[in-house]
């Protein structure tokens, strides 16, 4: 039987202040931002090698948790994959990550574009990740984190099968 994957599911709407105070919280700041309780809890889970699924409203700070995971993997010498459902979002995240001085190299793979595919952080569409898993899974051996942005697309009738 396969290894059990530890996971935390964090919904900031259901995390009480008291429960957070009684549990192990991660760092209080990251990239100049003060982290909310759910972000700190997610960081603590990531610090202890747990997988994290964050469900939160727009603007609640999910991206900062994803960036924390990527920085953590980078500090451990691992690669990171950041997936997005559409090319435009992949292109935007590529630009964002290239401006992050803590990330040594950033690549992009969208089907139309393939730049530096051996980079520390590789931004790609979800279809590219699926194809890589099927055709070249060994190339993912040193991956420490995979971020699925806009995971609610799993429920999309036209695109959902890619996420499954």
Region spans (language model):
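Helicase-associated low-complexity/disordered flanking segments
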Residues: 1-52
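Conserved P-loop/Walker A NTP-binding site and adjacent catalytic elements of P-loop NTPases
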Residues: 32-164
């Amino acid at each position: 039987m396969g290894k059990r994957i530890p996971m935390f599911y964090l919904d900031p709407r259901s995390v009480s202040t008291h429960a957070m105070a009684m549990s192990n919280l991660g760092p209080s700041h990251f990239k100049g931002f003060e982290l909310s309780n759910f972000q700190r809890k997610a960081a603590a889970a990531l610090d202890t090698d747990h997988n994290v699924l964050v469900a939160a409203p727009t603007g609640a700070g999910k991206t900062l948790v994803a960036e924390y995971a990527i920085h953590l993997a980078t500090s451990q010498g691992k690669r990171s994959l950041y997936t997005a459902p559409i090319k435009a979002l992949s292109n935007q995240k590529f630009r964002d990550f290239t401006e992050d001085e803590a990330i040594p190299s950033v690549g992009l793979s969208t089907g139309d574009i393939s730049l530096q595919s051996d980079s520390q952080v590789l931004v790609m569409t979800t279809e590219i990740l699926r194809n890589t898993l099927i055709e070249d899974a060994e190339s993912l051996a040193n991956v420490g984190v995979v971020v699925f942005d806009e995971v609610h697309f799993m429920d999309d009738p036209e695109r959902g099968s890619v996420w499954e």
